[in-house]
Amino acid sequence: SQIELRVLAHLSGDAALIEAFQRGEDIHDRTALGIFGANSGLDRKEMRSRAKMVNYALLYGKTAFTLARDIGVSQQAAQAFIDAYFAGFPGVRVFIDRTLQEARVSGVVKTIFGRRRPVPELNSSNGQLRAATERIAVNMPIQGTAADIMKRAMIDVHQALMAGPAGPAGR
């Protein structure tokens, strides 16, 4: 279902990402075409696999260095993939920047449903701590919202089962 990427589409408002989901496109194929192009020399399966890693790498705040290591390319190539991704989905870059800016001011990030997580280390003078907190600040609204959606769905299913023919006595 790619729920986290769907949540990202909603939160970022990125028109291309939203359109891809509305059309029922495979988002990893769409990303592959955008970052590798039609004549990359890679087969579709390999392109899709790498594009999937790029899609999720950016959700989790990976850098060109870590992405390069994960997909077995040079750091320069990984940076080119990241740049191509943001060129194809510019609303995602805006979302990341806006989320970090708002979190630096408020000290918290939130899910769509209002669940909050403090991120006081965003303004830390310790670069490693600040970078780790930036990854948390960007990821939490996405992953947290996806988790909230799944938890609400489980509650709805449980209530429907309890109200159904088997009901509580069917346990």
Predicted regions and their residues:
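Conserved catalytic core of nucleotide polymerization and phosphodiester-bond processing enzymes
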Residues: 1-171
